[in-house]
Amino acid sequence: MKVLQVIPSISVVYGGPSQMVIGLASGLAQENVEVTIITTDSNGDSGQKPLDVTLNCPVKQNGYEIIYFRCAPFRRYKFSLDLLKWLKAHACEYDLAHIHALFSPVSSAAARVCHQQKLPYILRPLGTLDPADLRKKKQLKRLYAAFIERRNLADAAAIHFTSEQEAKISERFGVVTQDLVIPLGVIPPEKVENGGSLVRSQWGIPQDSPLVLFMSRIDQKKGLDLLIPALEKLLESQHNFHFVLAGTNSQDPDYERKIKEQIANSALRSHTTITGFVSGELKASLLQAADLFVLPSYYENFGIAVAEAMVAGIPVVISDQVHIWQQVRDSKSGWVGATEVETFVKLIGEALQNPQECQQRGLNAQKYALEYFSWSAIARQIIQAYQDILTK
């Protein structure tokens, strides 16, 4: 089986939902699927230099290949005429395409090319069909859907959702297309010798202070307006902890600056470390150091950062708008609550006051994630879905 993965960018600056295509491709390759990723060299939306990669020819890694094409960005909208020309010429060599992202010109155009070339394709929305997400730039998206994405959804072989909740709430624009509900996978972080201690020493975090970690994009939907006041209240009530804010937002630097200023003008400032974007050994070390992971998002179609924390053995405190909240609750992998400040005061406080329970829920989280969020298990589910589509 030969499969194309099409995505606007796989740069690390776009976070887990884009990076997951790398894990998926590797998992599929291990199951003897021939995989080609086609993408652009986009590397951020605020004037960053493009990725330093070879363009227009295959780069082989981990059993699959990636072909990068020059991106012609307009603000955060990505387009590549070279990618589309390549797709039109080579679509006939593949059995199926898996297209990631809606409301992105390069993905939308790729869907039309696939349809014209009679290549079956699956669309993964990445949360863009969530009503909360559709409210952003509402009029533009309504027009875009009416003239472009509605037809793309109708012509798709299936829509790939990553949770039952995402499938349940997503807008379909009147289209009836088959759903695939298959979660994302995570790769367990490599152990860094004394990584947790080194991180604490590097940033002057007391060894006896529980480390509360937020590791995600600094975005308005992530609920930092709930988390920061909740942590302030916990400080007022004499709870001992150190907060680490790990993330950035190349698409909205003004909001990132606002959050940093809010913390700088708060009692939290002497109990907080702001790291910026982290990856590699530093990210793995932070996950080793963390005692609790928090994500009070207003909406999250899956929550890849939560799954990464779970597979690292960290108990999680999340909102019931992170769409894997039921798995977290049922597996006793952490605490789940409503998007309210007082709820997070209560849940984080309960976790901090019960270190043994915290540790047990971390073990539960790791066990669950290794079983259900491993790329090998997910790749097999996706291959079965591909085969079902191709035999219809």
Regions found by a protein language model. Give the residues of each.
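Conserved donor-binding/catalytic core segment of Leloir-type glycosyltransferases
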Residues: 4, 186, 200, 205-222, ...
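Donor nucleotide-sugar binding/catalytic pocket of nucleotide-sugar-dependent glycosyltransferases
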Residues: 39, 145-196, 205-207, 274
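A short helix/loop element that forms part of the nucleotide-sugar donor recognition site in Leloir-type
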Residues: 49-57, 191-205, 258-259
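Nucleotide-activated donor-binding/catalytic signature segment of Leloir-type glycosyltransferases, i.e.
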Residues: 256-278
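Aromatic "clamp/platform" in nucleotide-sugar-dependent glycosyltransferases that forms part
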Residues: 298
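Short hydrophobic beta-strand element within catalytic cores of glycosyltransferases
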Residues: 315-319
